[in-house]
């Protein structure tokens, strides 16, 4: 099975922008999601913070709006990224982003 697709909405808590050595523009945001979902007929609180990476020219038009406090919905795929400390973490690479506020 090769499906890897995710849609997640939430509030941006941090953001930064940079260009790679190849000149590709990147925006990196920390997305905070809070909701309630039913699981096994019980209501549970759901909370997650996850890094989202937006790469390339298609995101340049919204990059200025990706600031702390802004609500967004992100569609993309998940992958592991190795941090400077050598530990892997799950991140989302965005394929689409929609501003909600």
From Swiss-Prot:
Coiled coil: none annotated. The keyword Transport does not apply. Homodimer. Interacts with PriA and DnaT. Component of the replication restart primosome. Primosome assembly occurs via a 'hand-off' mechanism. PriA binds to replication forks, subsequently PriB then DnaT bind; DnaT then displaces ssDNA to generate the helicase loading substrate. One of its GO terms (cellular component) is primosome complex. GO terms for biological process: DNA replication, synthesis of primer. Residues 1-101 form the SSB domain. Involved in the restart of stalled replication forks, which reloads the replicative helicase on sites other than the origin of replication; the PriA-PriB pathway is the major replication restart pathway. During primosome assembly it facilitates complex formation between PriA and DnaT on DNA; stabilizes PriA on DNA. Stimulates the DNA unwinding activity of PriA helicase. InterPro entries: NA-bd_OB-fold, Primosome_PriB/ssb, Prisomal_replication_PriB. This is Replication restart protein PriB. Pfam families: SSB_1. One of its GO terms (molecular function) is single-stranded DNA binding. Keywords: DNA replication, DNA-binding, Primosome.
């Amino acid at each position: 099975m090769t499906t890897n697709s995710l849609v997640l909405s939430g509030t941006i808590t941090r953001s930064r922008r940079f260009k790679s050595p190849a000149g590709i523009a990147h925006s990196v945001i920390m997305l905070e999601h809070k909701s309630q979902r039913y699981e096994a007929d019980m209501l549970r609180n759901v909370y997650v913070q996850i890094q989202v990476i937006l790469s390339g020219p298609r995101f340049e038009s919204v990059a200025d709006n990706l600031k702390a406090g802004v609500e967004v919905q992100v569609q993309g795929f998940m992958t592991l990224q190795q941090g400077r400390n050598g530990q892997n973490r799950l991140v989302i690479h965005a394929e689409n982003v929609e501003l909600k506020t």
